[in-house]
Amino acid sequence: MSEISRVALFGKLNSLAYKAIEAATVFCKLRGNPYVELVHWFHQILQLPDSDLHQIVRQSGIDPARLAKDLTEALDRLPRGSTSITDLSSHVEEAVERGWVYGSLMFGESQVRTGYLVIGILKTPSLRHALTGLSAEFAKLKVEALTERFDEYVGASPENGLSASDGFNAGAAPGEASGALAPSAMGKQEALKRFTVDLTEQARSGKLDPIVGRDEEIRQLVDILMRRRQNNPILTGEAGVGKTAVVEGFALRIVAGDVPPALKDVELRALDVGLLQAGASMKGEFEQRLRQVIEDVQSSEKPIILFIDEAHTLVGAGGAAGTGDAANLLKPALARGTLRTVAATTWAEYKKHIEKDPALTRRFQVVQVDEPSEHKAILMMRGVASTMEKHHQVQILDEALEAAVRLSHRYIPARQLPDKSVSLLDTACARTAISLHAVPAEVDDSRRRIEALETELAIIRRESAIGVATAERQRNAETLLAEERERLAALEQRWAEEKRLVDELLETRARLRAAAEAVDAGGVPLGEGEVRLDEEQRQALHARLAELQAQLSALQGEEPLILPTVDYQAVASVVADWTGIPVGRMARNEIETVLNLDRHLKKRIIGQDHALEMIAKRIQTSRAGLDNPSKPIGVFMLAGTSGVGKTETALALAEAMYGGEQNVITINMSEFQEAHTVSTLKGAPPGYIGYGEGGVLTEAVRRKPYSVVLLDEVEKAHPDVHEIFFQVFDKGVMEDGEGRVIDFKNTLILLTTNAGTEMIASLCADPELMPEPEAIAKSLREPLLKIFPPALLGRLVTIPYYPLSDDMLKAISRLQLGRIKKRVEATHKVPFEFDEGVVDLIVSRCTETESGGRMIDAILTNTLLPDMSREFLTRMLEGKPLAGVRISSRDNQFHYDFAEAE
């Protein structure tokens, strides 16, 4: 034994046996025994929940109680009183050696299981004698039966999936542990079992979700797989569109027998590329594993189709170091048709790694998996709804499925359908399930705020006790604490009321469901003894259900504390948390918003009613589905002098239509005055610097397909830049530098220009003789044609913006002063008032007509706000609180009255 390293020998024990010998060593020391004996080890193994030894004891008819008693007595017979362990006994070391010999040579394993230890001990006379000396029960073990039917004996032992503790897969050949030799060939079909997963078996056992809406792609797969040669489809598409789902759908069809006869007995196995690469430490080992997988597939009695997900990892630079030759191993088998493969990768990785190898490209037939339409995605969601209901124990309404698709498509543009809609619905289900039992987030947040305020007050009182001036801080903190406690009381009262209504609502639904002999929210069929309801009782329950839903809806408003079912509101609240867009704005009736759009816009844009009505009409036509669906929602050129509300129109539209001003894509066209800057907008072509990074415009629209595109000062751009928009205005699409088609169909495009402003100013010089917008637009055509090509003007609607009159300036002044009022009241908690004289004074100072409404902002920013700010800061420094602010006009100047708090 001295020639064999003990570390190497004991390293062959699997993790369970190794931990047991470690525990035996500790146990031996605690008992004061000098040597670690077999009895220590077997005692510790039998203390575990399960192992090979447990299974063998059960199968051999050994009495566990008698065995435990015998082992305890054997332990008591050992000498005691030692302060330290001298060594492992020779029996333990010899048992491991014999276990390794029989495990590696008889069973071809690279680990020592506790079952192999038992066989090694029973096959060695001296060890067998020592074992039966521990307990006569061990004499019942039959070594011949154990070796012949070892798999039957160990059954579902937890040691089945373990490996040697030293991390090496095999140790049969000298020098292999050091990596000096290539790994030996695996047994028949061993590579398949080790490196692949049987998808058809998973489909047969119900582990795969039903796949809906990918019939066309599955049919293409079948067409290609039925070829005699080059029968290898490769699925390409963006991450999350469902490439793997197509293959799972194919596996489900094979199991259902819904495939041609030639494919009915086929096994579909997924190759685990990560497992194939893991531990392939030396050159050639990865290729050897792949070759053995290919050989197993080709030699299998049952035809096998191999599914390779993330196929680019097998090709050249796409894989790990040393995997460059992997694709060359596949090529001959793929070309001859002896290895049928379904591959999947993203389009970008396909172009980067596979397309560059023509020999590999011709062996694969591309099947494009596009993002599904909203309609198809809803069908897919209906397919997974029942699975989610069973998992989360909640009820999902059909409106939630539609909301998950539509809201995710609109507000989560960075991901693809159906992946993002499934994630959204899953989160909404989890939130609904939690809300039925947990404390609502609003209540929990309120409690945390109260704790924080109480801590702050305790600190203030401690400071006050040592003479620090804290009266103002204490007053503010006590006010906030009282408000928060009042808010918490209201929340808890509403929570209790909602809980009562939800419990009754769920109980009523359960009764109706039971009466209909349906399946409850958990997916479990109800018993036979359920009470039947007559028609009158059923109608009464339906009426009560409608009444409860109405009460709950009225109580909850747009901020529910408990979600009884997964509905539109539940899904919208998740989107609100993910995107920051208020849930109420999305849940509000979109059609109502569109119908009243001009009224909403007129509150913010002053004096341009004709323009807002024209834009609103176009949006209403598009929303009704009567416009050309392949064009953008609308394309308008807003012409007028500076400061009349052109840019503000874009911001107001984004706020009303798309949920916030963050959905305005602003491109300053004055930056594109040279012809070569076209590539900045749509992305550099191949071979140019910046290729692959996307264009300023195309990337922004790809990320935010529902947005307002504002092309500011478009007259300053180079004529070549104007021409790239022809296709966008006509067909609603633009190709970027990489050839991807960017969809503009859900955008509203506004171009602003100062061209023709002199003509507009002269036509509108007399307010009494103000021409109609159509007349101004007709007059504007001539100056616009000097800058823009007729083809561009013909593709858009020109809307002139009137110069601002005194009445318009007064309305804008009131709007701006109203915003200041809100800021003062929110920041300083004091009232803010102003009289009409202030408005007249502001308008009288607007002498620069070419600046429009911007002059009002300049007057307020440079005059009124600095004076107010100085007074606020001075009073904060002196500790004099304010009770209110009033601004008036006196001697052609702003006059400020600051009321002091008592």
From Swiss-Prot:
Residues that, per the record, bind ATP 1: G237, E238, A239, G240, V241, G242, K243, T244
A Gene Ontology cellular-component term: cytoplasm
Coiled-coil regions listed in the entry: 441-559
Keyword Acetylation: no
Key words of the record: ATP-binding, Chaperone, Coiled coil, Cytoplasm, Nucleotide-binding, Repeat
Assembly and binders: Interacts with TagJ.
Described function: Component of the H1 type VI (H1-T6SS) secretion system that plays a role in the release of toxins targeting both eukaryotic and prokaryotic species. Acts as an AAA(+) ATPase that disassembles the contracted sheath, which resets the systems for reassembly of an extended sheath that is ready to fire again.
One protein family per Pfam: AAA_2
Disulphide linkage map: none
Domain of life: Bacteria
PROSITE patterns: CLP_R, CLPAB_1
One example GO MF annotation: ATP binding
Annotated protein name in UniProt: AAA+ ATPase ClpV1
Repeat 2: annotated span: 88-151
